[in-house]
């Protein structure tokens, strides 16, 4: 039991040490309009909402199929405890066209939640790069490619699919979702995000998928992306190829749009989406005082003084001391008798 407690303490210390490096950015860092997810968290004190209104349309297949959907995606992201640990909630509400094709073709519509997933991701490795702007002696070294950029930052993802969804999406059980999130910053304008997921584990609807997204920034406000998502299921494989634009309206709001070509089993179709991402920024930077050797100074003369002055009774009695000091005494007047 003691060994277990020691191991837990060591693990918590290790995680706390890793979390000292911040994930907060001055501008919003949204996953939209792509389907992939960055390994970086939003940072403590950030409450971020990423929305997407979408329309999907494919050809009707024999027997039962879902050829059309109109819906709304929402991803909520925040961080409470550690800078590198993010908690998120993914949900989707949509109206689906359910079609039956045999001798005759018929259809009906179904509305409700198609997804409600609670998840968390933790950045286990963050790749650092050389600052080439400080290289002034060699033009070649200043503009040479940094091969460290081929090494990605890595995060692990763990989620739980709830079964609080509409009837056509129910799996009759709660199922886990696990994944690995990678990001390579090839330059200051180009990055590649790769996701590998194993979803709905332990159910008849389990699936394995990967997403590869390339993003390029035209300016500080405009960016574009290309993306390939492939999903392997027991009954069929789905592929979608997408592209789109994102516009940074201000530090806390991003607008985005996307278009996709779909291959779902033996049928094809298209997908279009428009979304808004915004955040509530309550982040506060934390600072540490270091000595000449880079070690943290736990107590400084100022902190010691604050501790002495910070006691309840010291503050309580200081009120009366201040009153005594500020209280003036009227001079006594002496009356003299007139002779």
Where are the regions a protein language model picked out?
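Bacterial Sec-dependent N-terminal signal peptides
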Residues: 1-28
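Transmembrane beta-barrel domains of Gram-negative outer membranes and organellar outer membranes
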Residues: 23-201, 205-339
């Amino acid at each position: 039991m003691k060994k277990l407690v020691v191991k837990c303490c060591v693990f918590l210390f290790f995680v706390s040490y890793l979390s000292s490096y911040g994930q907060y950015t001055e501008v919003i860092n949204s996953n939209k309009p792509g389907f992939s997810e960055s390994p970086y968290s939003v940072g403590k004190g950030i409450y971020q909402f990423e929305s997407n209104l979408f329309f999907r349309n494919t050809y009707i297949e024999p027997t039962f199929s879902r050829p059309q959907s109109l819906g709304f995606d929402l991803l909520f992201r925040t961080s409470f405890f550690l800078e590198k640990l993010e908690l998120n909630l993914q949900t989707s509400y949509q109206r689906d066209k359910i079609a039956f094709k045999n001798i005759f073709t018929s259809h009906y519509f179904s509305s409700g939640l198609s997804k409600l997933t609670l998840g968390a991701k933790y950045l286990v490795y963050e790749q650092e790069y050389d600052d080439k702007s400080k290289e002034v002696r060699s033009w070649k070294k200043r503009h040479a490619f940094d091969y460290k950029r081929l090494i990605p930052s890595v995060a692990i993802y763990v989620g739980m699919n709830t079964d609080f969804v509409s009837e056509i999406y129910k799996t009759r059980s709660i199922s886990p979702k696990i994944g690995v999130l990678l990001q390579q910053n090839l330059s200051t304008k180009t990055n590649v995000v790769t996701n590998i997921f194993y979803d709905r584990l332990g159910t008849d609807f389990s699936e394995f998928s990967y997403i590869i997204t390339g993003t390029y920034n035209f300016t500080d406000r405009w960016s574009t992306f290309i993306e390939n998502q492939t999903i392997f299921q027991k009954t069929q494989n789905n592929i979608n190829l997408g592209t789109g634009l994102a516009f940074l309206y201000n530090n806390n709001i991003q607008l985005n749009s996307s278009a996709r070509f779909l291959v779902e089993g033996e049928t094809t179709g298209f997908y279009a989406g428009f979304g808004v991402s915004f955040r509530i920024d309550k982040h506060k930077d934390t600072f540490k005082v270091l000595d000449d050797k880079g070690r943290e100074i736990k107590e400084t003369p100022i902190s010691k003084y604050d501790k002495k002055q910070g006691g309840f009774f010291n503050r309580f009695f200081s009120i009366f001391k201040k009153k005594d000091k500020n209280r003036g005494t009227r001079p006594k007047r002496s009356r003299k008798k007139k002779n």
